[in-house]
C-alpha cells in the first residue's frame, strides 16, 4: 500500500483549512480555494502537526467523496458482501484513507501550487488541472482533479490524477491484487487495512 501514499500526500496538502467554511461551488475556484487555504495554513508555524492532521481529516470528510472512492476501489467484490461487511469496509477504508492522507504532510509544507485550467467533461464532472511548481529539490508535478458536480452547490473530489496516474485506479488495482491472491477473502483485505492503520 506504500505505492499509494505519495499520491495521497499530494491531495493532503490541498485539504488543510485554517477555518471551517464552504468553498466556492465552481470547480476551478473550489480547488483553487482549497490550495490557497492549504498554503496559508501549512506555512503557519503556530499550528502544530497534530492540529494540521485534524484539519485535513475534517476537510477531507467534507470535500472528498470517500465513500464513492472506497466502493470503486473495492471493485466487483462489493456485490458479494452483506451490508454489515460493507459497513466494516467503509469504516476501515475511511481510516486508511485519512491516515494515508496525513502520513507525510510536513514534507510538502513549502510547496507552491498553480491552477492552470478547467475542462468540463459533462454536467457532472469537471477536470481541474494544476501543478506543483518546480523547486530546487523537486521537479514540476502535474495534478488533475476529478470534481463531481451532480450537486451544483456541493462539488466533491472523486479522483486525483498525478502525472497521468489515477489515485482511484491505483488503489483499485492494489486491492484487487490482494483479493485475487487470497481467493477474494475480504477478511485478508481487512487485515491489511488494519495493519496500516495501526502501524
Q: Where are the predicted features?
A:
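Short beta-strand edge/turn micro-motifs at domain boundaries
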Residues: 140-142, 146-169
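Boundary of Sec targeting at the N-terminus
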Residues: 21-23
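N-terminal signal peptide c-region/cleavage motif recognized by signal peptidases
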Residues: 17-19
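Sec-dependent signal peptide recognition
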Residues: 2-10
Amino acid at each position: 500500500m506504500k505505492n499509494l501514499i505519495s499520491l495521497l500526500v499530494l491531495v493532503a496538502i490541498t485539504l488543510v483549512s485554517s477555518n471551517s467554511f464552504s468553498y466556492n461551488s465552481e470547480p476551478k475556484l473550489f480547488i483553487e480555494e482549497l490550495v490557497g487555504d492549504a498554503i496559508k495554513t501549512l506555512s503557519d508555524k503556530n499550528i502544530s502537526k497534530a492540529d494540521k492532521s485534524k484539519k485535513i481529516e475534517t476537510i477531507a470528510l467534507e470535500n472528498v467523496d470517500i465513500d464513492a472512492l472506497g466502493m470503486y476501489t473495492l471493485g466487483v467484490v462489493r456485490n458479494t458482501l452483506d451490508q454489515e461487511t460493507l459497513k466494516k469496509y467503509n469504516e476501515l477504508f475511511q481510516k486508511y484513507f485519512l491516515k494515508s492522507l496525513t502520513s507525510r504532510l510536513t514534507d510538502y509544507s513549502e510547496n507552491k501550487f498553480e491552477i492552470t485550467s478547467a475542462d468540463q467533461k459533462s454536467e457532472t464532472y469537471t477536470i481541474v488541472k494544476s501543478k506543483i511548481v518546480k523547486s530546487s529539490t523537486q521537479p514540476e508535478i502535474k495534478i488533475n482533479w476529478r470534481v463531481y458536480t451532480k450537486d451544483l452547490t456541493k462539488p466533491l473530489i472523486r479522483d486525483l490524477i498525478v502525472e497521468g496516474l489515477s489515485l482511484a485506479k491505483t488503489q483499485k488495482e492494489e486491492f484487487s491484487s490482494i483479493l485475487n491472491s487470497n481467493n477474494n477473502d475480504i477478511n485478508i483485505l481487512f487485515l491489511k487495512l488494519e495493519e496500516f492503520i495501526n502501524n
